[in-house]
Amino acid sequence: MPDVGIRFRAFADEPTIRELKSQLRLACEIYNTLRWADIYFYQRDGKGLSKTELRQLALDLRKQDDEYKRIYSQAVQQIADRFYDAKKRFLKGLARYPREKKPHKWYSLVYPQSGWKVLETREIRTKSKKNKKKIMTLQLANLGVFKVIVHRDFPLDKVKRVIVKLTPSERVYISFVVDQEYPQLPKTNKTVGIDVGIEKLLITSDGEYVPNLRPYEKALNKTRKLHKALSRKKFLSHNWFKAKIKLARAYEHLKNLRRDIYMKLGKYFAEHYDVVVMEDIQVKQLVGKSYKKMRMRLHDVAFYELRSIMEYQLRKYGKELRLVDPAFTSMTCAKCGYVKKDLTLADRIFVCPKCGWTVDRDYNASLNILKRSGWEPPLAPVELRPLPLVKSQWQGGALKQEASPFRVG
């Protein structure tokens, strides 16, 4: 069964939050010590430390320093596992060698199957009959007690890990990693090609599109004010930290808004299609070639995050994501295959000089994407502009035409 992470908002008293911050700082020190030890043994013996050796070294550090004993022993071993996993990605050529971590960028502690205990669970009265919530009282070893707002049921006996995270916005989240199988959605025997863009978030080969809400661009003036307010404060002063938290909460709001939209999109496509085809876009190359405003919009859309969430949702429900070569998808006529190399970004309508095929350029690209996956797109007559997705089609919430209000603080 696949591991599924379920995240909940949590609350704790001030002493527990202070202890969490202190343990996160100590965890970062242990990680950096393991990193330098691995480099030392590699330079001396020509071989780095194994997973078992890293775990043992982490436990030895805990025995030697009373400060490190404040962290639960198995949470210390998980720090060693985190470094080993990062090093393994480097050895496979997937990432660079793990860098030294900064204390203010170490956000989480991991508890395995032991070290945590549910003390109490009780229901909360809400107006909605569908969205029933519970308050779970969770105790973490050597740390404290947290009140967790549980909005989704999950099997406690199948929990493999518990992760406590303190975000830059000073909010606490508890994640339960559960060994759980999601119910597989029925097969539809349908395949769709998707072209992602900036004007429209995505366009399908069925002639539908999702508008780009541009949450970051709309909130740009307010985030600039928060940046200016932070720069006016004395570095590391009490007011500087308050301004920093306000800015972090603003960005967290935008991040959560975008993630919520992408999760709903992934669920929608998993319900309506068996195979989703997208372009294998190299975002770094695309950003490097763009001008300033275009770069901002590319970062706002976050193509890689969209693709990752789409793949996660499709796999979760037993569906498939395919990636194809993005070269000339907009310039190639989906009807006759002619490549119109003089097509510019300003040309929103594709007119084929060879066969006369006239269609929205993004819709034409989505047809070519579908074609490259091995499926033949239905070239039925359509309007020049694709039709938008209807709100009633959404399951689990409608996609609004405007971003939700931007909140500060």
UniProtKB/Swiss-Prot annotation:
GO terms for biological process: DNA recombination; transposition. Zn(2+) binds at residues 333, 336, 352, 355. One of its GO terms (molecular function) is metal ion binding. Keywords: DNA recombination, DNA-binding, Metal-binding, Transposition, Zinc. InterPro entries: Cas12f1-like_TNB, RNA-guided_DNA_endo/Transpos, Transposase. Pfam families: Cas12f1-like_TNB, OrfB_IS605. In the N-terminal section; belongs to the transposase 2 family. In the C-terminal section; belongs to the transposase 35 family. NCBIfam families: guided_TnpB, IS200/IS605 family accessory protein TnpB-like domain. PANTHER family: RNA-GUIDED DNA ENDONUCLEASE RV2885C-RELATED (PTHR30405:SF11), TRANSPOSASE (PTHR30405). This is TnpB-like protein ORF409. It comes from Acidianus two-tailed virus. The lineage of its organism: Viruses, Viruses incertae sedis, Bicaudaviridae, Bicaudavirus.
